[in-house]
Amino acid sequence: MTARRAPAVNRDVLEQMLVDGTAALDIALTDAQRNQLLDYVALLGKWNAVYNLTAIRDPKQMLIQHILDSLSIVPHLRDRASARVLDVGSGGGLPGIVLAIVRPDWQVTLNDIVQKKSAFQTQMRAELKLANLSVVTGRVELLQPGVDVPEKFDMIVSRAFADLSDFVKLARHLVAPGGSIWAMKGVHPDDEIARLPEGSRVKQTMRLAVPMLDAERHLIEVIVDEAN
């Protein structure tokens, strides 16, 4: 049985979708950044069967549900310059690779426990020429600043990693003073917020509007005592 091939889509079509989507999000991209994002979509499609990166195979839907979805958090993080960012459970590199492309002033680290996915992330670092991107394999709760990663992080993000309370428990030791944890969620996670561990609280909740996607999305910022 042969694998189902992804439908072919003209790059110009994807580029126009990206132009329209970033305009709706009020994100200005250089030509180089736009090409990096389009190259990333192409590479996701090319290597998906090998690395099992995503169930989405249509390039248009990859652009919407992966790239624009990841970009939707950028306007809410605009004031954070020269940040150290950890993307937990990054998988195919989302949202971390997208953040590294559009914010070259950030140092972004991708984390996953699956070596095969870390290998893909490392390949993307080389192919997309992302000098501000690094990759670390292993369980986030076992990562130690100064050993596995250079230091603690200003922002720890996840897109599809775990229950919010579990995410906070596992990653809180990596939050730098003044930093916070950011979780991308679908429907508002009231039950998960109610289970947040002691010493953590929601600082703000933002409703995300993802262009061309009719689905509920939220961004939750959590602060922890250790980071204050």
Swiss-Prot record:
Keywords recorded for this protein, A-Z: Cytoplasm, Methyltransferase, rRNA processing, S-adenosyl-L-methionine, Transferase
A family per Pfam: GidB
InterPro entries (alphabetical): rRNA_ssu_MeTfrase_G, SAM-dependent_MTases_sf
Record's catalysed reaction(s): guanosine(527) in 16S rRNA + S-adenosyl-L-methionine = N(7)-methylguanosine(527) in 16S rRNA + S-adenosyl-L-homocysteine
Its job: Specifically methylates the N7 position of guanine in position 527 of 16S rRNA.
Annotated S-adenosyl-L-methionine binding sites: G89, L94, V140, E141, R159
GO molecular function: rRNA (guanine-N7-)-methyltransferase activity
Enzyme Commission designation: 2.1.1.170
Coarse class of the protein's main subcellular location: cytoplasm
Location within or outside the cell: Cytoplasm
Any one cellular-component term (Gene Ontology): cytosol
Family membership: Belongs to the methyltransferase superfamily. RNA methyltransferase RsmG family.
Encoding gene per record: rsmG
EC top class, as a word: transferase
Designated name of the protein: Ribosomal RNA small subunit methyltransferase G
